[in-house]
Amino acid sequence: MELHHIRDIADPLTRVIKDDPVRPHIPLEQRINQAAEILLLKAGEEILAATCLQWLTEIPKNEEDLKTVSNSKNVAVFYTIWSYSPGAGAALIRQAADWILKEHSEVRDIVTLSPQTEMARKFHLKNGALVHQTNETSVNYRYYHKAATE
């Protein structure tokens, strides 16, 4: 299984967004820009899972916060995830988090912007996340936090 990055809106693999069960209304141009990309978990040519990643300076509380385009890579936010194969969503989160920590030393937090559903809660807690905060319409699950150095 390999992690694949979609960073060009002309990439034919962007077709996967039609299957987004969480935030299907978010346009492609918001999913892929200087501060956002789509990550896929693939086995050969087969797509096993997909997630959308947004880079921000602060942990978002709602979808509106995702519209901030920043050059900062302090906070990595997974704001939707879906899979086509059992266990692939969990594997994608693990591989994506490993890649973020390896390639982006400046990252302070790896979090989600998740719906307030039991399915999301079970998925993220089972995969090692902690509840960071509950917002009016969402929950942030935290997969990584770099403690401030004194």
Predicted regions and their residues:
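A generic local structural motif
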Residues: 25-27, 63-66
